[in-house]
Amino acid sequence: GFVVTAEELASGVSIGDMAPYPHQFNTANELLALCAAQGKSIAEIKRENELSRRSAAVLDRGLTKIWDVMNDCINRGLERGGILPGGLNVKRRAKPIHEALMAERGLNMSAPHTINDWMSVYAMAVNEENAAGGQVVTAPTNGAAGVVPATLRYWLDHVPGATPKRIPEFLLTAAAIGGLIKFNASISGAECGCQAEVGSASAMAAAGLCAVLGGSPAQVENAAEIALEHHLGMTCDPVKGLVQVPCIERNGLGCIKAVSAASL
């Protein structure tokens, strides 16, 4: 299904009644063929499809808002301590981990593998906020909400040459991949396990990162495939049904896999 507003429901217009998108694709192969035939990136194809439904100003404001909500969620999660609700007595760990990372940075003592800790702490911050009832962006779900923002924040904060001007490219690319997965398979953990949630999120993040690192459409698709492939078989078995254990840490590992997939 799709989320619709009250106004959309009242209008009585269904998705099937809308004019077709200018660039129609149902598979990654079809998307890559469009990119090759038109000499465009995945983000450009996705953007032109979106512009058939809304103005450039509305689209750009929407993309900006999505990242603002994602980034604000990271920042809140990095600042809040305490115990998560639900009865498992899970401690919020993003805040102390972030404080330790900042202290190491100030002393110029960081080990090379510390970059993995940065990726993890960004993702954990989001999923601790989710577990506490905070506002997140479903990318593609609440339980996997930390992977895409953590990967984008990692790129912005830690990769030389990264610029906020390319955030829309990252998000549009990730959205194209997420749409393909939802159309052809599932993004529901209850239906297909965590491979459908964190696996899909990792694929989306890998694609977005590969795109802003200069990857071709084929490389972007391959990055998404690698990230998804290495989540296959992952089940959805949260302790006591709460989206905490193993979900919070799993998002951190999903981010690390996304970055590795983009590099490969």
Which stretches of residues belong to each language-model region?
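Aromatic-residue detector
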Residues: 1-18, 31, 97, 101-112, ...
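Well-ordered alpha-helical segments within folded domains of soluble proteins
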Residues: 145-150, 201-207, 255-261
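Hydrophobic alpha-helical bundle architecture
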Residues: 162, 173, 179-251, 264
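Membrane-targeting and insertion segments and their boundary/processing signals
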Residues: 37-40, 44, 118-122, 176-179, ...
